[in-house]
UniProtKB/Swiss-Prot annotation:
GO BP terms, alphabetized: fatty acid beta-oxidation
Family: Belongs to the thiolase-like superfamily. Thiolase family.
EC numbers on record: 2.3.1.16
Keyword Transferase listed: yes
Source organism of this protein record: Aeromonas hydrophila subsp. hydrophila (strain ATCC 7966 / DSM 30187 / BCRC 13018 / CCUG 14551 / JCM 1027 / KCTC 2358 / NCIMB 9240 / NCTC 8049)
Record keywords: Acyltransferase, Cytoplasm, Fatty acid metabolism, Lipid degradation, Lipid metabolism, Transferase
Pathway membership, UniProt: Lipid metabolism; fatty acid beta-oxidation
Superkingdom: Bacteria
Top-tier EC class: transferase
Subcellular location: Cytoplasm
Protein name per its UniProtKB record: 3-ketoacyl-CoA thiolase
Gene coding for it: fadI
A GO molecular-function annotation: acetyl-CoA C-acyltransferase activity
GO cellular component, one term: cytosol
Length: 436
């Protein structure tokens, strides 16, 4: 094992997570229909500021992310600062790392606090699958630019006459990888076939996720980290995630047909995450500053690591590459963990990663390590359910996982928790959290 990499300031202070909060997560075109991501971000940051009773002027920086970019608000972070009553002098910038976006925001803030350039900061992310940047065809886009430069009516007519009806049709956001043309679902199908992940195993994991998430809500474990969202037209507030199957029945999962490979496939709408709207944020500061302000940290950032692999095969295997790096940097092994929370983009992807965690062959051939990462104890794994149940607003999921894990570690008397996720582009992230 390599020498641990301590995430502390020059004075030896750890990076504390003082608060974490999120909106309820809503399926596309339901409770948050018509609400853009920037407004969801404003909601969660405003509520966090109100709950912590922290003077906004003390916040040095806000780092926020959004995966589905809106052209009218390209720097979502700055718009949140300007729209929540925070000091206009608060620095703000946006990040994007696909499904690992809010992990990246937290990592950036952590490094800034370590460097001493920032004392207190907010990190998070928001996404809306209900308010999408519907574009135009490349031919129409070029014509519009040319029209703007045309000098007379004849030139405009010549430009317009080249257009066909099909060129006028709206173009929805791409769902496939730019570099490969493959969708996430197609990659999940490939991983299911390559690693012999059965349909029954995928459905069982989805059923487990929904059952545990429903129980977590019933037990009141999530109420402190999710606030009731009041959004226009203010007809009915959303108090909790609306994707969770409250009475999940395993037998019902088998009734759904595969989506991405209709003949031989196993990935269905029930064992994949739905398109989701939501926002989440965490408040970070050096631990000494938390003491000065009389704030009790939820926990600390022990380590993090990012990874990148090929996009043509096993693109969603990022957790299996990032996790050993994060564990090494934390100076621990998988068996030292109290909790493990892996982003469930698809049941197939999750199960394939769990299989690789336990594989010595994978460790030797892909990681250059003698031993496997380790077999995951399912009693520690996604104990409150995962993204299959909660949903997945791309940029918000990381902050949800961090907050959820820290609260659960506190309920268990402390310990170490691992958060890990795959992301588009063959990216992966792993973060080790610590609670005393």
């Amino acid at each position: 094992m390599k020498e641990p990499l301590k995430l502390t300031t020059r004075q030896g202070e750890r990076i504390a997570v003082v608060a974490g909060l999120r909106t309820p997560f809503a399926k596309q075109a339901t409770a948050f229909h018509g609400v853009p991501a920037v407004d969801l971000g404003k909601l969660v940051v405003s509520e966090m500021l109100a709950r912590t009773d922290l003077d906004p002027k003390l916040i040095d920086q806000l780092v926020f992310g959004q995966v589905v970019q809106m052209p009218e608000a390209p720097n979502i972070a700055r718009e949140i600062v300007l729209g929540t009553g925070m000091s206009v002098s608060t620095d703000a910038y946006s990040v994007s790392r696909a499904c690992a976006t809010s992990f990246q925001a937290v990592a950036n803030v952590t490094e800034s606090i370590m460097a001493g350039t920032v004392d207190i900061a907010i990190a998070g992310g928001a996404d809306s699958s209900s308010v999408l940047p519907i574009g135009v065809s490349k031919k129409l886009a070029r014509a519009l630019v040319d029209l703007n430069k045309a000098r007379n009516l004849q030139q405009r007519f010549n430009i317009l006459r080249q257009l066909r009806v099909k060129d006028l049709l709206p173009v929805p956001p791409a769902v496939a990888e730019y570099s490969t043309g493959l969708s996430m679902g197609q990659t999940a199908e490939q991983m299911a076939k390559s690693h012999q992940i059965s349909r029954e195993a995928q459905d069982a994991l989805a059923h487990r996720s929904h059952t545990l998430a429903a129980q977590a809500w019933a037990d009141g474990k999530l109420s402190g980290e999710v606030f009731t969202a009041h959004v226009p037209p203010y007809k009915a507030p959303l108090e909790r995630d609306n994707n969770i199957r409250e009475s999940s029945d395993l037998a019902s999962y088998a009734k759904l047909k595969p989506v991405f490979d209709r003949v031989h496939g196993s990935v269905t709408a029930a064992n994949a995450t739905p398109l989701t709207d939501g926002a989440a944020a965490v408040l970070l500061m050096r631990e000494g500053r938390a003491r000065e302000l009389g704030l009790e940290p939820l926990g600390y950032i022990r380590s993090f690591a990012f990874s990148a692999i090929d996009v043509w095969q096993d693109m969603l295997m990022g957790p299996s590459y990032a996790t050993p790096l994060a564990l090494d940097r934390a100076g621990i092994t998988l068996s030292d963990l109290t909790l493990i929370d892996m982003h469930e983009a698809f049941a197939a992807q999750t199960l394939a990663n769990l299989k690789m965690f336990a594989s010595k062959e994978f460790a030797q051939s892909k990681l250059g390590r003698d031993q496997a990462i380790g077999e995951v104890d399912m009693d520690k794994f996604n104990v409150l359910g995962g993204s299959l149940a909660f949903g997945h607003p791309f940029a918000a999921t990381g902050a949800r996982m961090i907050t959820q894990t820290l609260h659960e570690l506190r309920r268990r008397g402390g310990g170490l928790g691992l958060n890990t996720a795959c992301a588009a582009g063959g990216l992966g992230v792993a973060m080790v959290l610590e609670v005393e």
